[in-house]
Every structure is written in structure tokens, then in C-alpha cells.
From Swiss-Prot:
It comes from Listeria monocytogenes serovar 1/2a (strain ATCC BAA-679 / EGD-e). This is Glutamate 5-kinase. It is found in: Cytoplasm. Gene3D superfamilies: Acetylglutamate kinase-like. InterPro entries: AceGlu_kinase-like_sf, Asp/Glu/Uridylate_kinase, G5K_ProB, Glu/AcGlu_kinase, Glu_5kinase, Glu_5kinase/COase_Synthase, Glutamate_5-kinase_CS. Keywords: Amino-acid biosynthesis, ATP-binding, Cytoplasm, Kinase, Nucleotide-binding, Proline biosynthesis, Transferase.
């Protein structure tokens, strides 16, 4: 099935805050520049690319020199407002170095829940892609309360990226994280942890491995990634979870190399488009 990834034309790339920021709260400019280069080159190759990016609050905290993330919703939304503007400025600068135009698309869950607004979003994304523009999608943190309260509607944009992938009928969602893939145990504490190369079904056993509340492995981060993977698989789409510290790994994925964990239902192999 990995070989079929070479045929992927429309890609959604999701990058999380942990990939965009250093642990000390500063912006990881090296990773962002590499990401801009990789995605711009994929466009040069003829691929259609959508970037789903977190990081508004993290970048806002850096811009405003806040040592810790604010706890109140109004403060978080104010920080997100500053951070989103700064984040797009950084993206525009780096993508511009490679001659690639980007466009901002901010979404909230209700927009994708209602048919008319969902259709508008689809039309906007299609229009951007037709013009060779890379849409940069983020949740609109200045108005979206649920994620800020950690009732996780989108869960650091994990689910949002899967929803976007379905909206545009993407061939592949690549989720760049701070972990190499999906493991049977915590690789940071278990030196013998084994990574899954491919998962064809999200079973209760797989969910249990991701960890739940109170487990030392999961704070919910991996669970939201599994939810996104399940959403993709139910839509007959493929998702790869891999480490985003070096975005050039995307080139290797597109060559069919065994990188990260591929989530794909078995029925996906027999999809109607004949490319798989």
C-alpha cells in the first residue's frame, strides 16, 4: 500500500505546536523554513497542498513575552489573535522565499457542521488550490471556545486536519507530530517500544494503547490523533503519523518509504479511482 502513496496528488499536511515551537517557548524557525521549502517543492512537482497549522497561542505567547500560557479564555483568545497574525507573517516570509503564495483560512467547528457554510469552505479551498495557492488552515481560536477549554472539538487541530482532508477529498493526510509514529508503549520510557508500521482498524485494544485519562502515556494527545485517523479511515482515506522535526521526511513518505504509521482501512485498496 505504501507504493500507492506515490500517486497521491492532493495532500493535507498537519503540523502541531510542538513541531513549530521549541520547548523553551521560542519559535523553531529552522523547522518552519524546511516545511515551507518542502511544501513549495511539492507544489512545483504538481501536487496540491493544504497546510493545517496549529501554533497561534504558542507564537502569541512568544510575541508577547509571556512565560506561561494564559488560563482565562479572553486572555487566550487575545494571545491567539496576536499569534495568528505573527504566524501567518512568518509563513508568508518563508514561503515567499520559494515563490509560493499562501492564503489564510480560519475555521470553527460550526462552519464545517452546517451544509451552506461547509460548501463555502470547500469552494474557497478549491479556488485556492486551482490558483496554485497553499491554503494555511487553523482553528479560529479568537472565537472557538471549545478547544481552548480543552473540551477538544478539534484537539490541537488533529480532527480539523481530518475534516479538511475529507472536505477536499485529499489522497493523503500527513500528520507531523513530536513522535515517530504509533507505539505499543511509551517510547520515552520503554526502550523496547515497538512502532506500528500500519494500522487497518482502530480497535478498543489500539485505543487502550494510546492511553486515556490518568495514564502516564496519554494526556489525550494520542487519542485525538487516533480519532483523526478513524475519521480518515471511515471516509476511505489514508493518514500517516510521523515525526515533524525534519519536514524533508515528507519527500521520503511520498516515495513510498516505510516511515511513521500508516492508517488505512483494507477496503481503501479497492477504491474506485483505480490509483491504489
Amino acid at each position: 500500500m505504501r507504493e500507492s502513496l506515490k500517486n497521491s496528488k492532493r495532500l493535507v499536511i498537519k503540523v502541531g505546536t510542538s513541531t513549530l515551537m521549541y520547548g523553551n517557548g521560542h519559535i523553531n524557525l529552522r523547522t518552519i523554513e524546511k516545511l515551507a521549502m518542502v511544501l513549495s517543492d511539492l507544489r512545483n512537482e504538481g501536487k496540491e497542498v493544504i497546510l493545517v497549522s496549529s501554533g497561534a497561542i504558542g507564537v502569541g505567547c512568544h510575541k508577547l513575552q509571556l512565560p506561561v500560557r494564559p488560563t482565562s479564555i479572553p486572555e487566550q483568545q487575545a494571545v491567539a489573535s496576536v499569534g495568528q497574525s505573527e504566524l501567518m507573517h512568518i509563513y508568508s516570509k518563508f514561503f515567499g522565499e520559494y515563490g509560493q503564495v499562501v492564503g489564510q483560512v480560519l475555521l470553527t467547528r460550526d462552519v464545517t457542521d452546517f451544509p451552506i457554510s461547509r460548501e463555502n469552505v470547500m469552494n474557497t479551498l478549491e479556488s485556492l488550490l486551482e490558483r496554485g495557492i497553499i491554503p494555511i488552515v487553523n482553528e479560529n481560536d479568537t472565537v472557538a471556545v471549545e478547544e481552548l477549554e480543552h473540551v477538544t472539538k478539534y484537539g490541537d487541530n488533529d480532527l480539523l486536519s481530518a475534516i479538511v482532508a475529507k472536505l477536499v477529498q485529499a489522497d493523503l493526510l500527513i500528520m507531523l507530530s513530536d513522535i515517530d509514529g504509533f507505539y505499543g508503549s511509551n517510547p520515552s520510557t520503554d526502550p523496547d517500544a515497538v512502532m506500528f508500521s500500519e494500522i487497518n482498524q482502530i480497535t478498543p485494544e489500539i485505543e487502550a494503547l494510546a492511553g486515556g485519562k490518568g495514564s502516564k502515556f496519554g494526556t489525550g494527545g494520542m487519542l485525538t490523533k487516533l480519532s483523526a485517523a478513524s475519521y480518515c479511515m471511515n471516509a476511505n482515506q489514508k493518514m500517516i503519523l510521523t515525526n515533524g522535526k525534519n519536514p524533508t521526511i515528507i519527500f521520503d513518505i511520498m516515495q513510498g518509504e516505510q516511515i511513521g504509521t500508516l492508517f488505512a482501512s483494507k477496503k481503501e485498496e479497492f477504491s474506485h479511482d483505480g490509483t491504489h
